[in-house]
Curated annotation (Swiss-Prot):
Gene behind this protein: proA
Disordered: annotated span: 423-442
Cellular component per GO, a single term: extracellular space
GO molecular function, one term: serine-type endopeptidase activity
Hydrolase recorded as keyword: yes
PANTHER family in the record: CEREVISIN-RELATED, PEPTIDASE S8
Catalytic site: 180 (charge relay system), 213 (charge relay system), 363 (charge relay system)
Broad EC category: hydrolase
Protein name per Swiss-Prot or TrEMBL: Alkaline serine exoprotease A
Length: 534
């Protein structure tokens, strides 16, 4: 089940000078087909670096049955039953439970309990919890000229700036979730459109900001003066304290809350990140699968973003930062995991005390993209997260950023294709043509990019045993199967969701009709084959 490996520290994606801050329920197959064979090796244990490790506290993640969507009631029931059984069996005092984005819990464990859990075949992996901290907030010149240059830049293809910002939409009917230090809902920038979701620091319903970072991010997404989507609804999800500190488990809890509570067209902003974390990556990936578009800060280490979480999550939109001259910000991470660049240096926005502040970081670039995602979701509220990503990338301006360090050269653009003249950066991608699968006949040589989907179908009679197998090649593709309609990221009957391309869906007794198959690129893939047998 692990889609990625390793685990390191997490920091905020805020940077100043050289410092870092940086459906309906799915049908369940016969239980015998869902059983995981007991592993002869103990579950993977990932320890945090000593300086940020939280002693004896661990995130325990369960093996998830293949044909159970994380958005289904069965997933929540499965998780709660697993927690109840394990806590009783091993005398564990559970601190919190994750039952929407990932299936697991957080608890303080003795060495004996840790050993017992690692030997339990129901456990997928265990990750030590760790401290997450923001570096001290440092302001730039609050009186700088052309303070809203970021907005000015994203509505035009080329420099120089024209000192105006225009958009085809304003985010009406869309909700943006800010997973951060909270939001000052009373700030004049928000005009009553901002509410608290949940506070995972104080464990209450008041996600007010006493740090500033979250309010600044929210202001760039949807502030009336400094925001991209000026009528979007904002929901603060507080996972970091007044001092900017928190934990990986707290951030996962925030992601889990969004996956459980988001409804309608939604986007989530995560202007935080750091070293690799399997649990955090899995939570974000699953939340995207539930239908929420996630915008992720690339990070501020001037390094390869693929080495950071959640920046490396392929189904999110990973954002690098630029300056007002269209250069990559010196602090911005880079590489193949970056999907788009956006203004991030010297960005003015709302502050927790009711005022305003100018700060820098991929933390500031990311909410520009979240705002544009809200505009595109208002344009078409039925688009999936992968389609939102495709729109952002295909509409972005090409070849404008200098010193990309091997990243895609795409600069965020807020308007629609109809307004971009001859410089649209290419047409929207179209899905691969749908094709019929014949029993025993493989379709080979399949390839695709991250987020790209391809559709196939199988027509069967009632009572047959159907197996759809994907295999071979390189990269990482995911297999989806659904009866009667094409699968989506949050509506399917089977989704093995394993690392690599070797995945199988089995239906013991088919219904009469058409089963639809979808292959989605978790990352770029090639040389893959698919075959149905019935």
């Amino acid at each position: 089940m692990l889609k990625k490996l390793l685990s390191c520290c997490i920091t905020s994606a805020l940077c100043f000078h050289s410092s870092l801050a940086f459906s309906q329920p799915n049908e369940i197959a016969d239980s015998a087909e869902l059983q995981q064979a007991p592993d002869t090796l103990p579950a993977t244990l990932m320890l945090a670096p000593d300086d940020i490790a939280i002693a004896d506290r661990y995130i325990v993640v369960f093996q998830q049955p293949q044909m159970m969507a994380s958005s289904s009631p069965e997933f929540e029931q499965f998780t709660q039953q697993s927690v109840d059984r394990m806590s009783g069996l091993y005398s564990i005092q559970v601190e919190s439970v994750f039952d929407h984005s990932i299936s697991g819990f957080v608890a303080n464990l003795s060495p004996e309990q840790l050993k017992d859990l690692r030997s339990d075949p129901r456990v997928d992996y265990i990750e030590q919890d760790r401290i997450l901290s923001l570096d001290p907030i440092v302001s730039a010149d609050a009186n700088q000229t052309n303070a809203i240059w970021g907005l000015d830049r994203i509505d035009q293809r080329n420099l120089p700036l024209d000192n105006n910002y225009s958009a085809n939409f304003d985010g009406t009917g869309v909700t943006a979730y800010v997973i951060d230090t909270g939001v000052n809902n009373a700030h004049v920038e928000f005009g009553g459109r901002s509410v608290s979701g949940y506070d995972f620091v104080d464990n209450d319903a008041d996600a007010s900001d006493c740090n500033g970072h979250g309010t600044h991010v929210a202001g760039t997404i949807g502030g009336s003066l400094y925001g991209v989507a000026k009528n979007v609804n904002l929901v603060g999800v507080r996972v970091l304290s007044c001092s900017g500190s928190g934990s990986t488990s707290g951030v996962i809890a925030g992601v889990d809350w969004v996956a459980a509570n988001a409804s309608g067209p939604s986007v989530a902003n995560m202007s935080l990140g750091g070293g690799q974390s399997v649990a955090l990556d899995s939570a974000v990936q699953s939340a995207v699968q539930s239908g929420v578009s996630f915008m992720l800060a690339a990070g501020n280490s001037n390094a390869d973003a693929c080495n950071y979480s959640p920046a490396r999550v392929a189904t999110g939109v990973t954002v690098g930062s630029t300056t007002s001259t269209d250069a990559r910000s010196s602090f911005s991470n880079w590489g193949s995991c970056v999907d788009v660049f956006a203004p991030g240096s010297q960005i003015k926005s709302a502050w927790y005390d009711g005022g305003y502040k100018t700060i820098s970081g991929t933390s500031m670039a990311t909410p520009h993209v979240a705002g544009v995602a809200a505009l595109y979701l208002q344009e078409n509220s039925s688009v999936s997260p992968s389609q939102v990503e495709a729109l952002i990338v295909s509409r972005a301006s090409t070849g404008k950023v200098t010193d990309t360090r091997g990243s895609v050269n795409k600069l965020l653009y807020s308007l629609t294709d109809a307004d971009c003249g001859q410089d649209c950066g290419g047409p929207d991608p179209t899905p691969d043509p749908e094709g019929k699968l014949t029993s025993g006949v493989p379709v080979s040589g399949l390839s695709g990019s991250s987020g790209q989907v391809a559709y196939y179908y199988v027509d069967v009679e009632a009572g047959q045993r159907l197996t759809v197998q994907m295999y071979g090649g390189s990269g990482d593709a995911d297999l989806y199967l659904r009866f009667g309609a094409k699968p989506t990221l949050n509506a399917w009957d089977c989704r093995p969701f394993k690392y690599g391309n070797n995945e199988t869906c089995t239906v013991s007794a088919t219904q009469s009709g058409r089963y639809h198959v979808m292959i989605q690129g978790y990352s770029n893939y090639s040389g893959v084959s698919i075959q149905a047998n019935y």
